[in-house]
Amino acid sequence: MDRTLKLPVGIDNFEKIRKSGFYYIDKTKLIEQLLQNWGEVNLFTRPRRFGKTLNMSMFKSFFQIGTDKSIFDGLYISQNTALCNEYMGKYPVVFISFKDVNGLTFDRAYDALVQIIGEIANGFSFLMNSDKLSKNEKEQYQGIIQIKDGKYHMSDGVVISSLKVLSQLLTKHYGKNTIFIIDEYDVPLDKAFQHGYYDEMVELIRGILGKVLKTNDYLQFAILTGCLRISKESIFTGINNFKVLSILDARFDEQFGFADDEVKNLLADYGLASHFEEAKEWYDGYHFGNVDVYCPWDVINYVDNLVANPTARPQTYWINSSGNSLVRRLINIADSTTKDEVERLIAGESIEKVVHLELTYNEIEKNIDNIWSVLFTTGYLTKVGEVKLPDSENYALKLVIPNKEVREVFILQIQEWFKEVVAKDNDEIRVLSKAILEADNEKIQRQLNIILDRMISILDTKARDRQKENFYHGLLLGLLRGSNPNWLIKSNRESGDGFSDIIIKPEDPDSGIIIEVKYATSFQGLDKSCEDAMNQINTRRYDAVLREEGRCNIIKYGIAFHKKRCKVVSDK
């Protein structure tokens, strides 16, 4: 392959990718699959950044009248000449995205939707001169594209019927029924839920979609995308021949996301084949239908970064492209059972959950099982198996965190949550601080055990002991730095013959504190690990740097951890 092909970072326009020399992984088989088995309304639900918009743009380029057919040359779909002759460039197409329907108030979101519909409708300005339309029909069209005070302006009734009217006018003009492609249909509902006008937005979206998708003689078929399948009773009431193609569906399972061989070929094409295992570890692991796929957004960004810098490390591209409030919501309301389940997920284990694919946004936080369901449908968790429920025909899904990147989301959100919890518990932190100054081992141990009990562990059970030790070192360091603003705290500072874990210089210029942290492989090994820590402090002369400053009243601590328990010993 010619390595001069640009990587389409952030580009989701199919025609632009094909005409402007961007790298493209062929997903045109999706067109054939849809046309062989389509419903009047077809809803694809996938997590964000999985190529939904690019695939919808591909559909538009394939079906719309006047398309440049050459952009499909050499692609899979071009081999099916009968299908191309029957469908390519044969239909009027309305492609509308709801991703920018947003606002702090309903009025602002409503206006954003009006502007989007007006702009889409204005793209069909030839309708004003069509000899196939009556004067009244042209006035209907004018009502959708009229400008007032520099913006599109429509009455409520016109907004509700706008898309259906467009289908009617385009069908009459071309003599062919209209295909509708509605991308990110659920974004307005998500934003409305976040900002407190959910009921008004549900009514608006239900009205618009109901008009254009239900009993519309001018509709050929419609394709919708979103992250969630909103309850049919909420939005899609009365729509017949409605096909939902979720991440559990084997149909079209390889068409959203990249397969193993596609990632291997992409890396090889840019001379980066040696990075395959790293890409797999970080960005693979999503199980859709019967296949495992990678997040395309991640892979394209990863390869683009490597092309610029072959030594670049993997980054959390998917995390950084949007908010991760769902994980935080789960943690905020987690009881002890849920905390244990989160710990198991982070440790690389699976949990079993009954997943509800049909929810409304205002049901998400009604119970914690609904949040688990949304974490699954939005890509934070993925399926690795099924378990039949006792005395039932239903199944629970075995869920895991798909890859390293998503694990980082959980860890980051847990760390932020824990910082806030600790910040609120000033009294307990002050007790810990005072106990450390007084060498009160029992009180230090009790306070640390209370904190450990409350927290959510982010340890991977497969991690090396040294990594586990580093985790507890970081935890203790964070607690100490928040305990007394007048302490000077150093971590892994070179001192004497080696490096001490933590050195504290209290306000008293004669005092100093040394802490060595150890990880015990069992509860029974806590005492021995404390002893090892104390021996290390003494044999490696960690107190040297304090004595050089005239700090002779030194307390030495050996603190050992195992899971959510610790042991403290000291020497003055």
Language model features by range: what are they?
Residues 10, 61-126:
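P-loop NTPase motor core
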Residues 121, 162-173, 200-220, 542-545:
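Substrate-engagement module of ASCE P-loop NTPases
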Residues 9-18, 108, 112-160, 188-194:
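Conserved P-loop NTPase mechanochemical-coupling segment
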Residues 234-237, 245-304:
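Amphipathic alpha-helical segments of the small helical/lid subdomains adjacent to P-loop NTPase cores
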